[in-house]
Amino acid sequence: ERAKSVDFAHPHYCTGGQIAAYKDGPLTVSALTGKTVGVQLATTYADAAKKLKGLKNIKTYKGDPEAFSALRAKKVDAWISDKFTVKATLDKNPDAGISAGEMVFVERVSMILRKNNKTLEDKLNQGLAEVMKDGTYKALSEKYFKEDISCRS
């Protein structure tokens, strides 16, 4: 829908909805059958949870901290949120006994541009291609995120 009013540069990173649960909990989409998941209200993660078949219940929370607290308190079986939010939360809570699980969906994140601004779009795409090719993007990605966050496909 947005593509009708704006243009997008090539994706500069990939993220998406990721499951987090206790290590012996539902860490895959198929394992969520019959389970209750916590999500932040009015997000793509809440939308994705609604599309999952077989969930017992979806509990929505004001924010991810509340959803994570519900998981820690075992009020939900799993939490679905942004991959990097899950990673940062688990890094800050290493003794929680909670692990990152399977991705529910992938989001390819791109810069939004004014419609028909081909010059800017081409320059951004060229610059991104150059730093991808010479390894700069991967090096910075690994330095700050501990992994390559580029969209490889």
Question: Language-model features: where?
Answer:
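Short amphipathic alpha-helical coupling segments at ligand-binding clamshell hinges
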Residues: 31-33, 82, 116-130, 136-140
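Periplasmic-binding protein-like
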Residues: 13-20, 87-129, 147-153
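Ligand-binding clefts/hinges and TM-proximal coupling segments of bilobed small-molecule sensing domains
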Residues: 44-61, 97-103, 128-153
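Short helix-initiation/N-cap motifs at beta->coil->alpha
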Residues: 24-25, 44, 59-69, 73, ...
